[in-house]
């Protein structure tokens, strides 16, 4: 078992004035297909870290993507092109690929993400390489993960369902805290006030809904 802190790794304390306290905040980890462990060092200067299978570290500076002073990064996922998708507290979602040092941010701005909220709390990537983003004000998906760095317009889209014949956004403006994808590619959404919603792979059919009453 290994235990990494700012004393023996590039992980950073955000309260460096207190030498007796560990204040490193890691909000997400994911392995790539080469066995590298990618880490979101939430309040660090270099917020993205990589630990190789051989034990070497590398840090990445994503500050060029930041548009809001609330700098914290949240969870991290990796798509089939080895691009990393990183949710942030107030800066949308960062996308990074080490091959070519490519970076991009999806924000609330039209044509540059059109996210319903800049607080992206959860990220999930399904079997079709579709990216699901849970924000403070609703759910959106991004369908062109492999082309994210080349697209001139890269808006995410809500899932539109029919409710008694009326088009509505799946989960409306609810806060989505977590998204899980099971082996059948079905989706599980954990919300702030609406319990858990379980849908088929494309989100069009609700398979179950769980709350305090059931």
Language model features with spans:
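Carboxylate-rich, polar loop motifs that coordinate divalent cations or form catalytic acidic clusters
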Residues: 1-214
């Amino acid at each position: 078992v290994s235990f990494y802190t700012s004393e023996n790794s590039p992980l950073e304390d955000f309260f460096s004035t207190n030498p007796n306290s560990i204040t490193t905040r890691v909000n997400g980890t994911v392995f790539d297909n080469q066995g590298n462990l990618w880490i979101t060092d939430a309040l660090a200067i270099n917020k993205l870290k990589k630990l190789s299978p051989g034990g070497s570290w590398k840090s990445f500076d994503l500050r060029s993507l930041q548009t809001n002073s609330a700098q914290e990064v949240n969870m991290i996922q990796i798509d089939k092109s080895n691009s990393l998708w990183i949710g942030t507290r107030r800066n949308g979602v960062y996308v990074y690929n080490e091959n070519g040092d490519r970076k991009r941010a999806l924000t609330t701005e039209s044509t540059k993400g059109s996210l319903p909220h800049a607080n992206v709390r959860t990220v999930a990537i399904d079997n079709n390489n579709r990216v699901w983003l849970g924000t403070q004000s609703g759910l959106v998906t991004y369908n062109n993960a492999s082309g994210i760095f080349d697209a001139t317009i890269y808006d995410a889209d809500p899932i539109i369902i029919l409710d008694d014949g009326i088009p509505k956004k799946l989960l409306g403006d609810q806060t989505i805290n977590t998204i899980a994808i099971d082996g059948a590619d079905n989706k599980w959404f954990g919300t702030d006030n609406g319990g858990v919603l379980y849908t088929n792979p494309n989100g069009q059919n609700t398979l179950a809904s769980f709350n305090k009453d059931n």
